[in-house]
Structures are given as C-alpha cells and as structure tokens.
Amino acid sequence: MLKQVFNQEGLVRRKWRWFFLLVLAAYVLAIVLMCFTPQPNLFKGIQTPHVIAVGRLRFLVVPLNSLWSLPQLSTPLELSWVIGQNVMNVFLLYPLVFMIHCLWKNWHSSSKSLWLGFRISLIIELTQLLLDVLIDANRVFELDDLWTNSLGALLAFYSYRWLHHRLSRCL
C-alpha cells in the first residue's frame, strides 16, 4: 500500500498529491478554528498561574511554566488541564509538518523543521494577540507554546525520516 502512495524519494506520488493537499488544507482550517476562535469564559474554574494581563492582552512568559506551577495547582482538573494542554501543543503542528514533509522535499532537515514549527507557532501567538486587541478573543500569548509547537514539528521530521527509512527498504 505504501508503495502506491509514496515514491522512492519518500514523497507523495502525483495521483495522491491532491488528497494530501486537501487533508493539509483541512488541517490548516482546523488549526485556525482551534487557535483563533474566541474563548469567552469557556474554562471557568481553571486558573493558569503566572498569567499577566495588560488590558485585554494576556501573557504567560514564564519559561516552563507548567513545571514551575505544578505545586500551585490545587485540583485534579487543573492538573490534567495543564498537562493536557502541553501535550496537545506538542502535537498541534505535528500532522501539519508531517504532511509538509510528505509533499515537499525542501523541508527535509531537523533545523528547517524546527524553524518552520517555531515560525508557525509565533504567527499563531501574535495573531491571537491581534485578535484580543480587535475582538477580545480571550487568548493568551504563551511562551511555552512556542517551544512545545516547535518540538512537535521536530518530532514530525523524525517520524517522517523513520517512515522514509522504512519505505526505502520496501521500495
């Protein structure tokens, strides 16, 4: 089955390319909805320590805030929220970057993947700030999101590299 989808370079074959591009576009839309939809009071009762409010803007600029804040979390809900949010941030860009590797070979390096993940993450965070200025979307600029999203992009590269290695032995 993989031989039908991928060529010897590990890229998606021409007849599957449209499908991967469609899935990629759908996933970009999902990211837009997840990251830019306003969240007015959706998470009452869940407090993230060290959030700084400047007018309508909210910032969380403490590096590794989740680790330093664990003792301050008082309920299982808060603990699961913080851990779950970090895990989800690692995997937010993973499918996107993995599909990019399957479609275009010019991203095939760990440094390019890491840089791509960081730039996409920074664009997301800055756009959330802009949305807070324009429509009070109740979003938080989180420094940890930058490194967790970038880590997900790096994991996508290594997953792709593993798949490419497996494919090269099969093809």
What do these predicted ranges mean?
Residues 2-138, 154-171:
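Bulky hydrophobic segments
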